[in-house]
């Protein structure tokens, strides 16, 4: 399964990759993660200058109230082409601006506004983010609950805490993992690791079951949908157990770097 990972404002794909790589490796062991850079060079000072080397990028620009956006259409067009040509992608992961943008793409896809030929996204990992405030965007992208399995990391000291909660509410049955940190890719304690491992395992099992069903239909007569025996489901789950791990047994130390 492939996940497209979108970085925060005026950072880079390699910076987000470094942060995510410090999480327990079993969490994303079954996935292939891609970390592209934003399409525009940073138009000002980056919060990670002196902490992580340039270049830095941004996906689009916005005003102080986050009600007006510049180059957003160009950004969306670029990402749709990227997803179409280098995908399919099973899900998105985002931090801050990357989270906000990912949520928009998923909402638009569900409403049939873009990525019509791309398979529906199956998962979303949101690390701080917000909804777009412009009514012309908001009233379309978040019109209905977004039916994608999602996990949302929300920091107690994050200046985007409330917007992150609002974005989580746009999804159907979101998993919310709270942490005491600020606007950052958080350190994960044992409880958070275990929750995330369980969440990813459920997605892998569901994805594997869908693939088995597809294979059965392809080799059948094309009309009848056959049920998968329970022992097949068990074998699927057990087959991924080693890769995913039973539980998180150590705390990860991710540098709390604001972006």
Indicate where each model-derived feature is located.
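Short beta-strand/loop motif that positions the catalytic acidic residue
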Residues: 146, 151-154
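Acidic catalytic loop of the alpha/beta-hydrolase fold
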Residues: 132-133, 154-162, 183-184
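Catalytic histidine-centered segment of alpha/beta-hydrolase-like enzymes
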Residues: 182-194
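Conserved loop-alpha-helix segment in the C-terminal half of the alpha/beta-hydrolase fold
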Residues: 156-174
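The conserved beta1-alpha1 loop
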Residues: 4-9, 128, 154-155
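Gly/Ala-rich beta-loop-alpha elbow adjacent to hydrolase catalytic centers
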Residues: 93-103
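Serine-hydrolase catalytic machinery in alpha/beta-hydrolase-like enzymes
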Residues: 1-88
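A conserved short beta-strand
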Residues: 115-130
């Amino acid at each position: 399964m492939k996940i497209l990972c979108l970085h925060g404002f005026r950072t880079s794909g390699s910076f987000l990759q470094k942060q995510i790589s410090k999480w327990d490796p079993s969490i994303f062991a079954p996935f292939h993660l891609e970390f592209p850079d934003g399409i525009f060079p940073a138009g000002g000072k980056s919060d990670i200058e002196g902490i992580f080397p340039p270049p830095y990028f941004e996906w689009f620009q916005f005003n102080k109230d986050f009600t007006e956006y510049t180059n957003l259409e160009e950004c969306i067009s670029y990402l749709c082409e990227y997803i179409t040509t280098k995908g399919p992608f099973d899900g998105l992961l985002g931090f801050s601006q990357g989270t906000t943008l990912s949520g928009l793409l998923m909402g638009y896809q569900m409403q049939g506004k873009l990525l019509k030929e791309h398979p529906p996204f199956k998962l979303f990992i949101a690390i701080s983010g917000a909804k777009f405030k412009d009514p012309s965007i908001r009233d379309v992208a978040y019109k209905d609950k977004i039916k994608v399995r999602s996990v949302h990391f929300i920091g107690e000291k994050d200046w985007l805490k409330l917007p992150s909660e609002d974005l989580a509410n746009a999804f159907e049955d979101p998993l919310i993992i709270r942490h005491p940190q600020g606007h950052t890719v958080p350190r994960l304690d044992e409880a958070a690791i275990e929750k995330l491992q369980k969440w990813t395992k459920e997605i892998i099992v569901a994805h594997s079951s869908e693939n088995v069903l597809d294979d059965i239909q392809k080799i059948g007569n094309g009309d009848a949908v056959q049920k998968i025996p329970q022992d097949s489901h068990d074998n699927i789950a057990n087959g991924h157990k080693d890769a995913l791990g039973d539980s998180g047994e150590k705390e990860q130390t991710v540098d709390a770097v604001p972006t």
